[in-house]
């Protein structure tokens, strides 16, 4: 134990502000310069110490509980809770063993058709979230550069008083709310509703800086902004092109399906500037210059067209505009031009084209290696065009398999806090608002009255531009006013650029609220001294609110393949943490729209942090999602069906995801014909029993069997 403590220079690892101070010092040192070796050394020491301390504390907690149970003469209560890993979008199921309220063990679920009992290194460490010493333990307020513990009532009262003052003085658009892809579907949906009732569209989340280019690119190509097939369906692929994806590290369990496909003869090609662990498993590795994905893909198309490998019937029946693409490709993207742009010889490009064309169905996989470029949307469109030319979309083993990042980034995008749409990609036009006013059980004119004039149907600020919304002149931000108050709700700024500008923007705010299970880099940056020549707004107030992890609440989560799974609550909230949706309700109650927010929900009287809270039941929130999100088919995935799927995982085929039949012993629901997780679109009400759609745009099946065609326009 003494060795562990020495790594923190003798300071008490349980001091509330220890990590904040460490982050602040580290960030301060990092702003001018930090070489790679220093970064690795610091991060390695921190992680090692954290894991060691966490394990020791876990043993202490378990021993204490066991001793108390023995003294009381009571046998230990052991429960197994089924949850879903939070570390990526694959959706691996985990069974958590809880003894007397302490999470003591975790096991991968062998019955899960998605992960089949497998783990990656990240998933194997899942339990650390339930016992981390680095958790934010209580509400805190920044006072004279240091965080001080305060009560929940003080924090909520002061925050809402500041919000009301800003709303009155500078309109509701003076506040910006950054949501989270770590929220479950119910929390993400409730946050968008909550922000709407506050009276602004200034809300966003992580998808803006990861896969929003994918959503726009694929949605405007064939109708839905999502992965077309599934990880499991890749077992049916005869060839696979990974471009901008290092799945072996980022989505390790997804590689199981590809390795099974390779056993069946699938040819794996990896296109990446780096030789990655995924490339190490490839049949062909192609190194391109960073940012030249479009020339490369159009170079592949050149050989497809030049050799007559395109699917002419498919193009004639289902594709519009391919003649214009062919003309552009054949004139501009000759092998010589492609090699000049990408640095890839013609023979390598030809081999990729030949492999994709002669081994159909062939699939394409991309991640943020494409999407985070400044032209990410165009790169996504190029990938889509290649698959349309080859006739691979809407076919098992083909498709565009787009691996999302966070565990619920797909769900948060579908039903959560987007600045340019309401849940389900309903736009901001009056018709959309009237639809939701009806669903929410409130008057349309009441919602309209919550907004500043002309702002209700105007897109809000994005997470990538909130800095400008603070620092630029008001007439330059295309909003009613500058942003003066900011919520970081399950989001941290580490992955964004412009760190110095971000620090200046944070210093200029009048209100900064961080809602997170951990004291994130946001909290550290806020506590740092201002940059040279800068100053902190003397009226600024900074608060940290401890939220629970997803293992201390319950709700649904949408994997990258559009399958939805239900998480059980594993343990009660640690320390003084409170679930996100409960915090939303508490703020709404103080802001004057709590009744309107929860009018449709069953309300629970819950105990958190030693006090009573009004909690909207997550099942009730999902029921409202089922009644509202008709555009993309979130209507059939009721809590009852999802819970039955989680209990009956063993009846679903790991290759097709289809149930061979079996009744849930708890609810009596018969899973026969369902696809696991009821991947959207799952049309109609639960009574219709739509099975879900495993592969989008599959015309070999009827709509009621999970098939369907392209949509004429996104949102139709």
Where are these regions (language model features)?
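Short amphipathic alpha-helical segments that mediate assembly, nucleic-acid/protein binding
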Residues: 16, 20, 618, 639-644
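Non-catalytic, alpha-helical, charged scaffold/linker segments
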Residues: 657, 662-664, 668-671, 675, ...
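N-terminal export/assembly segments and adjacent metallocofactor-ligating motifs
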Residues: 2-309, 318, 325, 345-346, ...
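Detector for glycine-centered tight turns/loop "hinges" at secondary-structure junctions
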Residues: 101, 145, 397, 561-562
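Non-catalytic alpha/beta scaffold blocks inside enzyme catalytic domains
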Residues: 211-385, 389-395, 403-631, 635, ...
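N-terminal compositionally biased, intrinsically disordered segments and leader/signal-like regions
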Residues: 8, 16-18, 161, 632, ...
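Surface-exposed polar/charged interaction patches
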Residues: 29, 33, 628-631, 652
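Polynucleotide-recognition surfaces of large bacterial nucleic-acid defense/processing enzymes
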Residues: 569, 633, 644-661
């Amino acid at each position: 134990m003494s060795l562990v403590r020495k790594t923190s220079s003798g300071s008490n690892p349980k001091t509330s502000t220890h990590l904040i101070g460490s982050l602040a010092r580290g960030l301060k040192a990092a702003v001018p310069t930090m070489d790679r070796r220093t970064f690795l050394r610091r991060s390695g020491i921190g992680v090692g110490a954290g894991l060691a301390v966490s394990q020791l504390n876990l043993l202490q907690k378990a021993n204490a509980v066991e001793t108390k149970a023995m003294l009381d003469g009571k046998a230990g209560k052991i429960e197994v809770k089924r949850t879903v890993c939070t570390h990526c979008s694959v959706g691996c199921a985990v069974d958590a063993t809880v003894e007397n309220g302490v999470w003591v063990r975790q096991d991968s679920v062998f019955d899960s058709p998605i992960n089949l009992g497998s783990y990656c290194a990240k998933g194997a460490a899942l339990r650390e979230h339930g016992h981390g010493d680095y958790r934010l333990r209580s509400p805190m307020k920044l006072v004279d550069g240091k965080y001080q513990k305060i009560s929940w009532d003080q924090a909520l009262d002061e925050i809402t008083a500041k919000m009301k003052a800003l709303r009155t003085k500078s309109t509701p658009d003076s506040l910006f709310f950054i949501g989270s892809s770590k929220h479950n579907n119910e929390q993400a949906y409730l946050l968008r509703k909550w922000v709407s009732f506050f009276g602004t569209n200034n809300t966003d989340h992580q998808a803006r800086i990861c896969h929003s280019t994918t959503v726009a690119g694929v949605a405007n190509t064939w109708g839905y902004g999502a992965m077309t097939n599934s990880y499991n369906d890749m077992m049916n692929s005869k060839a696979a092109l990974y471009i901008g994806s290092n799945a072996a590290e980022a989505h390790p369990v997804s590689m199981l399906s590809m390795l099974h496909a390779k056993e069946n003869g699938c040819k794996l090609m990896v296109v990446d500037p780096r030789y990655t662990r995924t490339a190490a498993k490839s049949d062909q590795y192609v190194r391109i210059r960073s940012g030249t994905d479009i020339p490369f893909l159009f170079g592949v198309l050149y050989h497809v067209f030049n050799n007559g490998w395109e699917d002419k019937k498919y193009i004639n029946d289902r594709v519009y505009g391919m003649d214009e693409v062919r003309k552009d490709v054949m004139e501009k993207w000759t092998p010589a031009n492609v090699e000049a742009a990408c640095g890839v010889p013609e023979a390598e490009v030809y081999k990729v084209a030949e492999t994709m064309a002669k081994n159909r169905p062939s699939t394409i996989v991309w991640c943020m290696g494409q999407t985070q470029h400044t032209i990410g949307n165009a790169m996504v469109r190029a990938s889509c065009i290649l698959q349309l030319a080859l006739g691979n979309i809407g076919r098992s083993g083909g498709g565009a398999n787009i691996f999302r990042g966070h565990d619920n980034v797909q769900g948060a995008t579908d039903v959560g806090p987007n600045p340019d749409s309401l849940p389900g990609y309903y736009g901001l036009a009056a018709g959309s608002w009237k639809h939701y006013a009806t669903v929410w059980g409130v008057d349309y004119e009441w919602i309209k009255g919550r907004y500043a004039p002309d702002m209700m149907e105007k897109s809000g600020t994005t997470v990538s531009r909130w800095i400008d919304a603070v620092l630029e002149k008001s007439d330059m931000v295309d909003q009613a006013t500058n942003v003066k108050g900011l919520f970081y709700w399950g989001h941290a700024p580490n992955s964004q650029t412009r760190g110095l500008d971000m620090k200046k923007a944070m210093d200029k705010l009048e209100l900064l609220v961080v809602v997170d299970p951990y004291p994130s880099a946001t909290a550290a940056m806020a506590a740092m001294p201002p940059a040279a020549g800068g100053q902190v707004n003397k009226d600024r107030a900074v608060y940290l609110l401890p939220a629970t992890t997803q293992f201390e609440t319950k709700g649904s989560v949408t994997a990258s393949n559009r399958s939805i799974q239900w998480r059980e609550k594993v343990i009660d909230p640690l320390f003084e943490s409170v679930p996100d949706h409960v915090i939303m309700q508490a703020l709404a109650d103080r802001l004057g729209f709590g009744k309107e927010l929860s009018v449709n929900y069953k309300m629970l009287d819950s105990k958190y942090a030693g006090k009573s809270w009004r909690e909207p039941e997550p099942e009730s929130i999902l029921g409202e999602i089922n009644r509202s999100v008709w555009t993309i088919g979130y209507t059939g995935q009721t809590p009852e069906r999802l819970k039955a799927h989680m209990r009956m995982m063993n009846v679903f085929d790991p290759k097709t995801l289809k149930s061979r039949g079996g009744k849930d012993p708890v609810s009596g629901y018969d899973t026969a014909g369902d696809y696991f997780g009821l991947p959207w679109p799952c049309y109609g009400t639960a009574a219709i029993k739509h099975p879900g759609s495993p592969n989008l745009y599959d015309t070999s099946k009827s709509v009621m069997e999970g098939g369907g065609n392209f949509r004429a326009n996104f949102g139709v």
